């Protein structure tokens, strides 16, 4: 197994009850020693290396900035993270195990799996990794990427032109977002559209979840991380397998980790 050079980027925004330092500490404990935070104005300042935005970029453009930074790092693998998560200490080793048996049709591997992605008809899905079939993905909290795929994402026509879901916003709001790009959000939605519809790839999730969403408030308004906004089965908790115990399907040699 080759040593994998990582670039981990964290998108941070102002919160009444910030969790950023908890996120950084968890990443460090898992072995990601140098995450870089991309911080919106008035955000909590952590101990991590930080790029401070002088003006507000908003959810979408701050994430794009972070993703492009990671792509310029020369890393073998990239992880894009939100500022209100925890990860199990074995998460990096698990992610590298998957990277070395990377599914050919994968858009990304999410270390975070919300409740409704871990059950089917009310019953727990088997432990392992599997693609999710959905029109719109939910929760881009902690995503592992091959650089070649992430580069396709950020350079895609949909990413360049993304304003939001036209069916969900009126003409007035659409025009407002065009004038003020910092209002553009729906990160998880656009990633799902590009991966599923445009690139015809799949989004992979792990069960149990290696990551938990711990927010007590939303940076864009809304409720705390409960119900479908949190993981139901968390690795290493309540008798669930640790990340090192989650089965990873073996791929044929030509399907292994290739940049």
Which residue ranges define each predicted feature?
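An acidic/histidine-cluster motif and surrounding catalytic segment
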Residues: 1-81, 85-259
């Amino acid at each position: 197994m080759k040593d994998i050079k990582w670039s981990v980027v964290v998108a941070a925004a102002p919160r009444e009850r910030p969790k950023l330092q908890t996120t950084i500490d968890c990443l460090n404990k898992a072995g990601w020693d140098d995450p870089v935070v991309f911080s919106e104005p008035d955000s909590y300042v952590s101990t991590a290396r930080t790029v401070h935005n002088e003006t507000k970029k908003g959810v979408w453009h701050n994430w794009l900035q972070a993703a492009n930074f990671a792509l310029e790092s020369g890393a073998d693998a990239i992880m894009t993270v939100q500022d209100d998560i925890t990860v199990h200490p074995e998460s990096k080793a698990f992610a590298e195990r998957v990277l070395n048996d990377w599914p050919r049709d994968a858009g990304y591997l999410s270390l975070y799996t919300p409740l409704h992605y871990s059950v089917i008809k009310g019953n727990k899905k088997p432990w392992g990794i599997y693609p999710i079939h959905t029109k719109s993905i939910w929760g881009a909290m902690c995503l592992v990427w091959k650089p070649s795929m992430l580069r396709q994402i950020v350079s895609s026509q949909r990413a360049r032109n993304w304003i939001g879901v036209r069916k969900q916003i009126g003409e007035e709001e659409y025009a407002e977002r065009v004038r003020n790009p910092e209002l553009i959000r729906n990160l998880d939605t656009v990633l799902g559209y590009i991966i599923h519809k445009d690139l015809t790839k799949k989004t992979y999730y792990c069960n149990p979840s290696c990551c938990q969403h711990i927010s007590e408030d939303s940076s864009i308004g809304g409720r705390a991380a409960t119900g479908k906004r949190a993981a139901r089965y968390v690795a290493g908790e309540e008798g669930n397998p640790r990340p090192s115990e989650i089965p990873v399907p073996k791929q044929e040699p030509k399907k292994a980790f290739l940049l």
